[in-house]
Design a protein with these regions (language model features):
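Terminal-region recognition feature
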Residues: 1-285
Length: 285
C-alpha cells in the first residue's frame, strides 16, 4: 500500500522521486541516502527530481550532509512535504528550489537538542534545548528588572532616600534570582551558543551555496529558523513559511488527494529511503 501511494505521487509529478522517511534522521539514514548515490547522479542529469521528506528531524550534522549530497547530485530539486519536515528535515528542504506543502503540512525551527557537559545537569530531562536555557535567562533578567522597579517604587513611596532605596532594591532583586543563576553553568551556555551558531552556518551553507547555478532557498530568512521561534515544537505552516521567504507552493487538487492517502499510512512507516521505480510503461525517468 505504501509503495503504491509513492508510485502515485511519482506518476502525478511525472518526474523521478526520491523518498526520505525517517522517525529520526541519523548517521544510518545518511548512509542509506549515500548508498543511492549512483542512481541519484543518473536521475540528477535530467532537469529536476523530487525528494519527498517526512521526518520530525534528527542529528544536525547528518541532516546537513544529506542536504549537501542531494544538492551535489543535481542543480535543482523540489521538496514534497505531505505532512511534516521538522527541525533538521527543514534544513534539508533549504537545499530545494521549491517546497510543495499542504495547508496541514509543517516545517519546524532548528533548535539543536544537546547534552549538558556537566554531571549535575541544569535540565532534569535528557532533551535539552538551547532555547530553554536562553529563555530562562531572559525571564530571569526581566523578572529581576521588574522586581527592582517595583521595590524602588514601594521604598520611595515610603519616604526612603533614593540612593538607599536603590541599594536595598538591588540587593533584594539579586537575592531573588541568585539561587537559580547559581544552577546555570556558563560552560553549558557557551556550548549551547556554539550549537546555535553551528545550526546557522549549516543553514547558510545549504540555502546559499557558493555555486550560483544551484537553485536553492537562497532568499529564505534562514536565521529565523534558529533564532526567532519560542519553542522547538513551533509549527511552521504554509503561511509562516511564506513569511520567512521560503519558496513554497501548494499541491494541485489531484496531488493533494494522494497526499491524503500518504498521511493515513505514514505513521506506520518508521524508515524508508530510496528511489521510487519508474512506471512500467516507460514513463519519465
Amino acid at each position: 500500500m505504501f509503495t503504491t501511494v509513492l508510485s502515485e505521487i511519482r506518476q502525478n509529478r511525472n518526474r523521478p522521486l526520491f523518498v526520505l522517511v525517517a522517525d529520526y534522521i541519523d548517521g544510518d539514514t545518511l548512509d542509506d541516502v549515500f548508498s543511492w548515490r549512483k542512481e541519484l547522479r543518473e536521475v540528477g542529469q535530467g532537469e529536476s527530481f523530487d525528494v519527498l521528506v517526512h521526518s520530525p528531524g534528527g542529528q544536525l550534522t547528518a541532516c546537513f550532509m544529506i542536504a549537501r549530497l542531494l544538492c551535489r547530485f543535481t542543480g535543482r530539486w523540489e521538496a514534497l512535504v505531505p505532512q511534516i519536515a521538522g527541525s533538521g528535515a527543514t534544513m534539508i528542504c533549504l537545499g530545494s528550489s521549491n517546497i510543495v506543502m499542504s495547508e496541514i503540512s509543517q516545517l519546524g525551527p532548528l533548535d539543536p537538542q544537546v547534552a549538558s557537559k556537566k554531571r549535575e545537569k541544569f535540565f532534569a530531562t535528557e532533551r535539552q534545548s538551547p532555547l530553554e536555557a536562553f529563555e530562562a535567562l531572559r525571564y530571569l533578567r526581566e523578572f529581576a528588572v521588574a522586581s527592582l522597579d517595583a521595590l524602588m517604587e514601594v521604598l520611595t513611596d515610603r519616604g526612603i532616600a533614593p540612593q538607599k532605596a536603590l541599594e536595598t532594591s538591588v540587593e533584594i532583586a539579586t537575592n531573588l534570582v541568585k539561587p537559580v543563576l547559581e544552577k546555570i553553568d556558563p560552560y553549558d551556555l557557551g556550548a549551547f551558543s556554539l550549537d546555535n551558531k553551528l545550526a546557522i552556518n549549516y543553514c547558510k551553507e545549504v540555502a546559499r551555496p557558493p555555486d550560483p547555478n544551484r537553485k536553492t532557498q537562497r532568499k529564505a530568512f534562514y536565521k529565523s529558523l534558529v533564532e526567532d521561534y519560542p519553542v522547538h515544537e513551533f509549527a511552521i505552516d504554509f503561511g509562516e513559511a511564506q513569511a520567512i521567504n521560503l519558496a513554497v507552493s501548494q499541491p494541485p487538487v489531484d496531488l493533494e488527494v494522494v497526499f491524503d492517502k500518504f498521511r493515513v499510512i505514514a505513521s506506520k512507516i518508521k524508515s524508508y529511503v530510496g528511489l521510487v521505480p519508474a512506471p512500467p510503461d516507460g514513463g519519465s525517468q
